[in-house]
Curated annotation (Swiss-Prot):
One Gene Ontology biological process: negative regulation of cellular response to hypoxia
Entry protein name: Regulator of hypoxia-inducible factor 1
Effect seen on changing S157F: In ia38; loss of inhibition of hif-1 activity
Organism: Caenorhabditis elegans
Subcellular location: Endoplasmic reticulum membrane
Xref: InterPro entries: Acyl_transf_3_dom (IPR002656), O2_lipid_transport_reg (IPR052728)
Physiological role: Involved in the response to variation in environmental oxygen levels by inhibiting hif-1-mediated gene transcription in a vhl-1-independent manner. Plays a role in susceptibility to killing mediated by P.aeruginosa and by pore-forming toxins produced by B.thuringiensis. Probably by preventing hif-1 transcriptional activity, regulates behavioral responses, such as locomotion speed following acute reoxygenation. Plays a role in normal egg-laying probably by regulating spermatogenesis and in body morphogenesis.
Entry membrane topology: Multi-pass membrane protein
Induction and repression of expression: Induced by hypoxia.
GN (gene name): rhy-1
GO terms assigned for molecular function: acyltransferase activity, transferring groups other than amino-acyl groups
Length: 502
């Protein structure tokens, strides 16, 4: 009896996504010991040793603040505060609001997953909680589809990447590419490296042991290395600080973005054709993945990226099979980024001005499409065992890119409108803290494991009541991290980047 085409496709997709080699128990022990030794070589094993370099750095920041004419003056807290409070007064200020909404949505997503002990421990009550969230007539889809906050970030990232590249688009390609990537690395790497150092070591284990057990215990040396090399979205499973996968995706998309942007700048029609074709191809690949793995009824990928207790390799594989590949790889996730890239190109190349009525019409229609896309997941919640129906397959393939187009439409309506309306300065400040809030919000979410109100929650309303407290604590932590880590290091790296001609 011959195998079905579906079986062949599934086998091919499994082979492409992961090749598993047999290893003896002795080999596994040796690999574990090697990984442990390599990890300990870079991360101290006591809180005192791990905190010493951090305290030394903070001391230098304080010295730079108190002695403004010293060699450490570039680390000054006063300078960092001034930078944080500086207003840009640009038509792109509207992006700050979208960025803030996106991080709140991501926080909401994680509060409703990693914030719950029953989900972390895979207890029976976790399924009841998830059903209660999905079944809510108003907020069910908003909660279940909250991972769409990532698509907002991808649109913004693509838009800003395009504007950054096109400012010097006439420079020699490879010279410009190296400078473009170096600047992005200098933007993302320092804060992320220091956060991983704290999160993967004894400091976080002492403060939040449950975070360490579910987020870090499965890391080993290679898991940590994947984060500092921006390849964590290519891990076989997202069990090592899985929520940081976005940084790897962002860097990889930045690395290939100049190919599209160079073509858009020199041959606009060809560039448009290549970009649109790639977006469509990404949708087709998404449909292929969900069809092959039978996961088209799980479009929202509503599972936490953690290390579950007592799991073996096969259980782990079954939990994330297909979903992780579809959710994190550049070829399945590039659509929203490329849509933002096109919008960024249009904002640079076009001087078009919208009259007020056109701007309002575009914004409102785009908002309606965005809301409709969010709530179009409801048939999956109403029929959770429907499987790979045509509706589920098409929705899984296109909904992230359609949502990205709707977000881009709203941004375009605000950017090209005739009248300029400045946004509230508070959004500019919050937007500057968003990157650190993204890094730090997950440990904050774990603090709420001790909140009985959240653990007993049975409605999305309960999550919405907790969200402001998660956001406030996350942004307070982000402010401290910004003042002592991101801004001072940014001042140093910008000086060296200027000297190197980047």
């Amino acid at each position: 009896m011959s195998s079905s085409p579906h079986t062949h496709t599934l086998i091919i997709m499994e082979r492409l996504s992961e090749v598993r080699l047999y290893s003896s128990p002795m080999t596994s022990v040796l690999n574990s010991n090697l990984s442990s030794c390599l990890t300990n070589a870079f991360i101290p094993d006591t809180v005192r040793m791990a905190s010493s370099p951090l305290l030394a750095w903070m001391t230098l920041v304080v010295i730079g603040t108190l002695a403004p004419v010293s060699v450490f003056s570039c680390l000054s807290l006063k300078r960092s505060v001034k930078e944080l409070l500086t207003e840009r007064s640009s038509k792109l200020d509207v992006l700050d609001i979208f960025r803030f909404v996106a991080i709140l949505w991501v926080m909401l997503n994680h509060t409703g997953s990693e914030g719950r002990i029953d989900i972390l421990d895979r207890l029976p009550s976790a399924d009841a909680f998830k059903s209660a969230m999905h079944d809510h007539p108003i907020f069910g889809a908003l909660m279940g589809n909250s991972a769409l906050g990532v698509e907002i970030f991808l649109v913004l990232s693509g838009l800003l990447a395009a504007r950054s590249w096109l400012r010097k688009a006439d420079e020699p390609f490879f010279q410009h590419w190296k400078s473009f990537i170096a600047r992005r690395l200098l933007r993302l790497a320092p804060s992320m490296f220091i956060f991983v150092y704290i999160a993967a070591g004894p400091i976080m284990n002492a403060l939040l042991p449950r975070y360490s057990s579910s987020m870090v215990s499965a890391c080993g040396f290679w898991g940590i290395l994947s984060h500092v090399t921006f390849t964590s979205n290519w891990q076989s499973t997202p069990t090592c600080m899985g929520y940081l996968w976005y940084l790897g995706l962002d860097m990889q998309l930045y690395m290939v973005a100049p190919i599209f942007l160079n073509l858009l700048h020199k041959f606009p029609k060809r560039g448009m054709a290549l970009t649109i074709t790639t977006i469509i191809a990404s949708m087709v690949i998404r449909a292929g993945y969900c069809t092959a793995y039978g996961t088209c009824n799980q479009s929202d990928v509503d599972i936490p990226f953690i290390s579950y207790p007592g799991q073996d390799a096969e259980t782990l594989k079954s939990i994330y099979a297909g979903l992780w590949d579809m959710y994190s790889r550049p070829y399945t996730k590039c659509g929203p980024f490329l849509i933002g890239l096109l919008l960024g190109y249009i904002t640079v190349s076009s001087k078009y001005i919208m009259v007020s009525t056109t701007s309002k019409t575009l914004f409102r229609s785009s908002l309606i499409v965005a809301i409709a896309t969010i709530y179009a997941i409801l048939p999956e919640y109403w029929n959770p065992n429907a499987g790979n129906t045509l509706y589920n397959t098409v929705y899984t393939a296109v909904f992230r890119s359609v949502f990205a187009m709707a977000i881009s439409g709203m941004i375009a309506a605000l950017y090209f409108r005739q009248e300029y309306r400045p946004t509230n300065p508070i959004f500019a400040m919050l937007a500057k803290l968003t990157y650190n809030a993204y890094l730090l919000h997950m440990p904050v979410v774990y603090i709420f494991n001790w909140l009985p109100f959240l653990q007993a929650a049975t409605s999305p309303i309960h999550l919405l009541l907790v969200l402001p407290f998660v956001a406030i604590l996350s942004f307070i932590a982000a402010l401290i991290f910004y003042l002592f880590i991101e801004a001072p290091i940014g001042h140093l790296t910008s000086q060296y980047a200027t000297r190197l001609g980047l």
